[in-house]
Amino acid sequence: MSKVPSLIEELAKPIVDELNLELVDIEFVKEGRNWFLRVYVDTPEGGIDIDQCAQVSERLSLLLDEKDPITQNYYLEVSSPGAERPLKKDADFEKAIGKFIYVKTYKPIKDMKEFQGYLTSYEEHTLVMEVRIKTRKITVTIEQEKIALARLAIDF
């Protein structure tokens, strides 16, 4: 089951590259009785439109029908990663410098496992965030291997 995203990445990447788009993430999840293959794509500058998603969906659907790499029945969804796009690759973190992000860690750091704040730097798989706790700002350094989830967030 965990191999599905990497198999699909091999098929989707050439399609996405040919359309000058970016492959952001792939999920293969079961919700209720149904399986969903979700492919998140974007433009390099951000802001993909529905026609671009449809192009990826049509091409990928044909290729999936031909190669048939997934044994379960599933629904294919191709969409934008949204405003709270995941941060997984080095390039994702580098693009997010200066932006407001949410990070959840596997184990507590400074007695906390969830952080929201501005990403101030990212070097050598380590990120530095400026986090607001009540009325004070603190700097938190988190190694990428300790991150369970990272995504862009909306600052209210």
Swiss-Prot record:
Instruction: Answer yes or no on keyword Endoplasmic reticulum.
Output: no
Q: Which Pfam families match?
A: DUF150_C, RimP_N
Q: Which InterPro entries match?
A: Ribosome_maturation_RimP, RimP_C, RimP_C_sf, RimP_N, RimP_N_sf
Can you list the GO cellular component terms from the UniProt entry?
Answer: cytosol
- Primary location recorded for the protein, binned into one broad class: cytoplasm
**Cell location:** Cytoplasm
The disulfides recorded in the entry are none
The UniProt keywords, alphabetically, are: Cytoplasm, Ribosome biogenesis
Origin superkingdom: Bacteria
In the record, biological process GO terms are: ribosomal small subunit assembly; translation
User: What is the documented function of this protein?
Assistant: Required for maturation of 30S ribosomal subunits.
The family classification in the record reads: Belongs to the RimP family.
Name of protein: Ribosome maturation factor RimP
- Species assigned in the record: Lysinibacillus sphaericus (strain C3-41)
